[in-house]
């Protein structure tokens, strides 16, 4: 409720009065478009780039200086890496199923990345049908001794035809143990990118420590309750800038 927030006492006035005063001071209108309320044993904030990105991290289990420092580091991580979820447990079954479906379809539409046994079956179908032109069939016969470079020589139409064959045979391919391992690996990689606790901690000395392991090294009782990330113009048309690289440079510099 933004109206309730505007009426909230703030530094001897109300939030609304403070905004009016700020507008008068800088000559530019200031308004609140959205806000988040957080709660926990401790909460820290981090502002990047003169206010272009703001992050709040709330946690439970500890509130000492070490916990605050750790959460500030995590807030910088959130500013740079912009995770979608705190942990995998926050992803609904529907969202996970959608991610898996997208990953499977992406793999099938990129035949060059498919496991060799599956790719070879698709090529056999293309060679024994009209899916490929005579020219592409000849190219395959010439280059099949080195499959790693085959797609450098096949036409775009030939690659697209293999993708169509793969999608048509989707049920059988998805049930293949080798393909399942490939798809599961790609999903796991994506989860590590979008889940904060699974991300590699940006200040990890070994380049491998996850955020979860970093928090555990600070205090095993420290758990993240909520993360809020705001970016100027978020949800509105804006110039695309590489905030992530800028924050990462600040962290490492």
Regions found by a protein language model. Give the residues of each.
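N-terminal assembly/interaction segments in proteins that build large macromolecular machines
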Residues: 1-253
């Amino acid at each position: 409720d933004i109206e309730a927030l505007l009426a909230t006492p703030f530094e001897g006035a109300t939030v609304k009065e403070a905004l009016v005063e700020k507008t008068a001071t800088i000559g530019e209108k200031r308004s609140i478009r959205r806000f988040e309320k957080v709660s926990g044993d401790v909460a820290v904030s981090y502002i990047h780039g003169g206010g272009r990105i703001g992050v709040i991290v709330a946690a439970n289990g500890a509130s000492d200086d070490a916990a605050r420092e750790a959460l500030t580091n995590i807030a910088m991580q959130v500013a740079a890496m912009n995770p979608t979820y705190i942990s995998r447990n926050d992803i609904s079954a529907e969202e996970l199923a959608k991610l898996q479906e997208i990953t499977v379809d992406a793999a099938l539409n990129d035949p060059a990345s498919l496991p060799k046994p599956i790719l070879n079956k698709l090529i056999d179908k293309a060679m024994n049908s009209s899916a490929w032109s005579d020219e592409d069939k000849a190219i395959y016969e010439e280059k099949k001794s080195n499959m790693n470079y085959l797609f450098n020589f096949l036409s775009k139409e030939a690659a697209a035809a293999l993708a169509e064959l793969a999608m048509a045979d989707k049920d059988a391919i998805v049930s293949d143990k080798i393909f399942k391992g490939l798809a599961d690996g790609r999903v796991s990689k994506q989860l590590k990118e979008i889940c904060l606790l699974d991300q590699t901690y940006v200040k990890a000395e070994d380049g491998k420590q996850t955020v979860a392991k970093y928090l555990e090294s600070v205090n095993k009782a420290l758990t993240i309750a909520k993360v809020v990330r705001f970016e100027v113009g978020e949800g509105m048309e804006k110039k695309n800038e590489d905030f992530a690289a800028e924050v990462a440079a600040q962290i490492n510099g």
